[in-house]
Amino acid sequence: MSATAAITTRHDWTLAEVRALFEQPFNDLLFQAQSVHRQHFDPNRVQVSTLLSIKTGACPEDCKYCPQSGHYNTGLDKEKLMEVEKVLQAAAEAKAIGSTRFCMGAAWKHPSAKDMPYVLKMVEGVKKLGLETCMTLGKLTQEQTQALAEAGLDYYNHNLDTSPEFYGNIITTRTYSERLQTLAYVREAGMKICSGGILGMGESVDDRAGLLIQLANLPEHPESVPINMLVKVKGTPLAEEKDVDPFDFIRTLAVARIMMPKSHVRLSAGREQMNEQMQALAFMAGANSIFYGEKLLTTANPQADKDMALFKRLGIKPEEREEHADEVHQAAIEQALVEQRDSKLFYNAASA
């Protein structure tokens, strides 16, 4: 495939084709990925999101990589659902440091009926602040998905994690088909999809290819594809797993960019472990989204000022979205906070 040829969006990738991409010489692969990237995106713009854990710990799932699983002793304190106003305050702070999307994550197998009203209020409030909204709450029913869409949720994150073949080695409490069903519900409800996976769990190159095939062969590509590098947490079964080779990680980003040319490819968890040179290679490979702030749910993330310093050195600017004038935006913040303060949901969220 010529690096400069026009790229058509495909949904029929085969393992042999994706293997061939992975097996290219490193420079050829990066050149092809960067060429594809430039056909659809400004190469010097990166979308910036902030992630907040709105409910931490004691998750009933047994994901072997996750410090929030109740199956493992990782020293993580269990926390109740965060109050709506605190979520809105965190969103306003994220906005102030340059984030355009606010992502809220809860350590649940699925949201309960009693939690949904608070979650919906969070979505509505963050939207009023002028931010895009994203949530990751676990498995959803069709009714819950529709309610989130009606509240104004822009993105729903539900990662596939790895290939179907390797998946059973990592998670036994939820099936791969259940994950795909949730993604189908999200798409049917008219929301955008954020879905990717994790590298460094002991998977093979074919498993990495298999993950990308599952994502790229969906009826519509995910708008956002987070590629995570395993953050090894003491107490989890993967705490002693071998490190991912940095070049293998960059290769996966590049292949994701080629296969899903119009998606934002997010350099996600594990960035704290990457030096500036590796992050620069990631942007060259087509990564054009990051999480911004000091924490990703429960693990460290590069500090915001370090990110902006690196952006400046590389000539990168945060991706912009249409904004209200400052005074209109400030009024929206104040109004949203007042509405949440006056709501019964505001008072009861923490004890629900």
Curated annotation (Swiss-Prot):
Q: Where does [2Fe-2S] cluster bind?
A: 103, 134, 194, 266
What's this protein's name? Biotin synthase
- Summarize subunit and interaction data from the UniProt record for this chain: Homodimer.
Residues that bind [4Fe-4S] cluster: 59, 63, 66
What pathway annotation does it carry? Cofactor biosynthesis; biotin biosynthesis; biotin from 7,8-diaminononanoate: step 2/2
Q: Which residues form the Radical SAM core domain?
A: 44-262
Against Pfam families, the record matches this protein to: BATS, Radical_SAM
Q: Which CDD domains match?
A: Radical_SAM
